[in-house]
């Protein structure tokens, strides 16, 4: 996360310098702007551009040369293979929402919904890995069989799929494979 914050600070610095210089050039050539106005406009424009960059501009091809952050946002169909007493396979849907600094994951099945508590994509041995901790919220009819639980997932980020493993505090483990929907 610190690398991402440092990157965002550098991008903000560059935006600020560029807009400041552009406004000085405009002030000297086109229309007279006072120093206080130049500083005010620079801060305002840089703030909005930084917010836009953090929310969505970092995904644009133009800005991809400045960062290597994987864009995994979207809807996925997933196969969950679980091992706990009995084992089985379950089809689930996953929605990933992402900004430059945050990742939020929601997994839905016929029995539960789980939401990420913390999540981050890190580089591990040259690969992007999504780690996230989650809490489950079972439907009332499944609460005794599948109570509220906390767990962690480690997924290797591929082009259009994520694959990996999860484990929980109830000693449940399993494999998870997500395929991005178009």
UniProtKB/Swiss-Prot annotation:
Q: Please indicate if the UniProt record lists 4Fe-4S as a keyword.
A: no
Principal localization? membrane
- Which terms does the record give in the GO molecular function aspect? nucleotide binding
Q: Which domain of life is it from?
A: Bacteria
Q: How does it assemble?
A: The beta barrel domain oligomerizes; in the presence of cyclic nucleotides (probably 3',2'-cGAMP) higher-level oligomers occur.
What does the UniProt record say this protein does?
A: Effector protein of a CBASS antivirus system. CBASS (cyclic oligonucleotide-based antiphage signaling system) provides immunity against bacteriophage. The CD-NTase protein (CdnE) synthesizes cyclic nucleotides in response to infection; these serve as specific second messenger signals. The signals activate a diverse range of effectors, leading to bacterial cell death and thus abortive phage infection. This system triggers membrane disruption without lysis. A type I-B CBASS system.
Q: What is this protein called?
A: CD-NTase-associated protein 15
Species for this entry? Staphylococcus schleiferi
Gene encoding this chain?
Answer: cap15
């Amino acid at each position: 996360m610190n690398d991402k914050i440092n990157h965002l600070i550098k991008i903000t610095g560059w935006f600020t310098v560029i807009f400041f210089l552009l406004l000085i050039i405009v002030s000297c050539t086109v229309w007279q702007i006072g120093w206080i106005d130049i500083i005010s406009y620079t801060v305002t424009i840089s703030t909005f551009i930084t917010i836009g960059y953090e929310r969505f501009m970092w995904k644009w091809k133009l800005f991809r040369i400045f960062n290597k952050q994987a864009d995994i946002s979207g809807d996925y169909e997933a196969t969950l293979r679980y091992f706990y007493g009995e084992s089985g396979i379950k089809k689930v849907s996953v929605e990933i929402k992402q900004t430059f600094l945050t990742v939020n994951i929601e997994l839905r099945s016929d029995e539960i919904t789980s939401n990420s508590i913390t999540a981050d994509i890190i580089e591990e041995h040259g690969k992007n890995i999504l780690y996230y901790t989650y809490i489950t919220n079972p439907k009332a009819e499944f609460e005794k069989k599948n109570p509220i639980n906390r767990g962690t997932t480690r997924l290797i980020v591929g082009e259009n799929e994520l694959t990996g493993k999860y484990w929980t505090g109830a000693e449940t483990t399993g494999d998870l494979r997500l395929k991005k929907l178009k």
